[in-house]
Amino acid sequence: MKSLELTLVEDPIIEKLQANGWTFTPSDQLERESYKEPLLVNPLIRAIKKINKGIGIEEKEIWLAVRELQSRGPGIEAAKQILKFMKEGIPVRLEKARTVEYIRLFDYENLNNNEFIVSRQIIHEGTERIRNDIILYVNG
């Protein structure tokens, strides 16, 4: 039997999001490396390749961008930096071009180039083990 929270809160939210193009993925089917990793790394890499295909980005440079996101710890300053990355992209030096390019995490011009995933009852481990009711992922 479903709990009241699932029936009255989570199900309606998920249904509304699905009606607006979001894909529901059960938490046990998310492409996660561990409970400690908040990012969906494989979808993130796919999105970076798709969104930034015109700048000549290579696998090594994609991983530099991913590591830059992963290296941010908790706290307000880290959150500010991640928000800046989300808005402007992550600066990465491209070896072939010998220039610094901003690797975009989202396609703001063509929203269909982004992957929208909603999931529920997602476990995360940090200083504590928590279970989030609903999490929205855009490009991982």
Task: Give short role names for the model-derived ranges.
Residues 1-140:
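An alpha-helical interface "stripe"
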